[in-house]
Amino acid sequence: MNYFNKLCFRKRINEIKKCRFMKENEFKNENKILKNKKIVIVGCGSQGLNQALNMRDSGLNISFALKKNSILRKNSSWLNATKNNFEVNDYESLIPNADLVINLTPDKQHENVVKELQKLMKKNSCLGYSHGFNIVECGEIIRKDITVVMVAPKCPGTEVREEFKRGFGVPTLIAVHTENDPKKIGLEIAKAWAFSTGGHRAGVLESSFIAEVKSDLMGEQTILCGLLQTASLICYEKLIKDKHNPSYAAKLIQYGWETITESLKHGGITLMMDRLSNPSKIKAFKISKKIKKILSPLFKKHMDDIISGSFSKEMMIDWHNNDKKLLNWREDTKKTPFEKNILSYSEKISEQEYYDHGTLMVSILKSGIELAFETMINTGIINESAYYESLHELPLIANTIARKKLYEMNIVISDTAEYGSYLFSEAAYPILKDFIMSLEKNVLGLSLPNTKIDNIELYKINEEIRNHPIEIVGKKLRKHMKEMKSICVAK
């Protein structure tokens, strides 16, 4: 049974609102509580491998437990682990001696995996998650002697590693399951784990399993993955309709999201909009308002379905139907004109050109970020959590599109994120397409001409941008991100 739905109303509200930005000195003990402990990660996919690499580099003893069949077949998980010189063995050999077992298998495997793990885990050990779906949406009940914690980096596993190698980290939510903290050491374990992945350098929120799941599902379905996918497909089609070189069009979209969203990391929507010329800023602002009006009902529907549990229920039906919907959506995405275009445009597009020729892309980003944030806080999710799930994680997702378009994004995000992204995109595409196709040519692929500016109008627009609640909380949170590194942009 859905854990969230069985709670009384007041507890639901308290859990969904739980969010506290942790101070730097709360990590002064670093990862001492986990030093010389046996840590076993189950599953060596994107999150499993990249968290393990960071944790090993932070001085921890990490090994991988895989199913016997995976080891015999030498599947991708076995190859990932052995290629990176980790100890690998089956569940029966590693789990009984583990102090901390971290379950990083895909969400749809959790029910069966966790049942197996509980039979093998020693008394008073700890079970870790990086997404609370199994606990919150599936209602998994864990043995009472086991401490259950979560460390949820707010990005795909590949970016957990890349940011760590840059000397930084990714914003991270940590939580202790209220039903499973028998020795009251869950928070210390979660802090040490987050420290070991580098999360403390970017900012850590002490949250709850419920707040993480509900905000995570909303962010990934809408602005982070669903809207990026929808916008990529429609923007490419608009460029082709407006007679642009298909290869230039593909490059502008593929690398444009990464280049433009880099400004979000350093100065939020304000800086992103400031990178535009004044005529482009005014145009982007007005388009953004219209997009918000068009997409607002869809964002609210997704949030409502996430809170009620109906989204999870429908997705789990698809799991039991061999992922029929998900696999069909995946194949359909591969066949889109944007994905099929083979990038051959060899000329460099300057960083500023991505902004000058991407007024529409900036409009879409602004509207999606604000809508996701507003919808979450109107549901009771706290501003800090909504910020991480809407704005700060966005550049990290955009980086994946820059590597191999939507294919890369969809293979590195979680299975729940991929399903939710397709679900949103299927509904958003027809709603948004007619509006975007009706816009003038110079909002995408061309620069807007310099025209006379109404100073009062520009002043009011700047004030509205800078005083949006996401900009206020973002400015506060970014003060803690002193070690943030810029990525290589503009190809």
Swiss-Prot record:
The active site is at residue 131. Mg(2+) 1 binds at residues 216, 220. It catalyses: (2R)-2,3-dihydroxy-3-methylbutanoate + NADP(+) = (2S)-2-acetolactate + NADPH + H(+); (2R,3R)-2,3-dihydroxy-3-methylpentanoate + NADP(+) = (S)-2-ethyl-2-hydroxy-3-oxobutanoate + NADPH + H(+). Binds 2 magnesium ions per subunit. NADP(+) binds at residues 44-47, 67, 77, 107-109, 157. GO terms for biological process: isoleucine biosynthetic process; L-valine biosynthetic process. Mg(2+) 2 binds at residues 216, 389, 393. Involved in the biosynthesis of branched-chain amino acids (BCAA). Catalyzes an alkyl-migration followed by a ketol-acid reduction of (S)-2-acetolactate (S2AL) to yield (R)-2,3-dihydroxy-isovalerate. In the isomerase reaction, S2AL is rearranged via a Mg-dependent methyl migration to produce 3-hydroxy-3-methyl-2-ketobutyrate (HMKB). In the reductase reaction, this 2-ketoacid undergoes a metal-dependent reduction by NADPH to yield (R)-2,3-dihydroxy-isovalerate. Belongs to the ketol-acid reductoisomerase family. This is Ketol-acid reductoisomerase (NADP(+)). It comes from Buchnera aphidicola subsp. Schizaphis graminum (strain Sg). The lineage of its organism: Bacteria, Pseudomonadati, Pseudomonadota, Gammaproteobacteria, Enterobacterales.
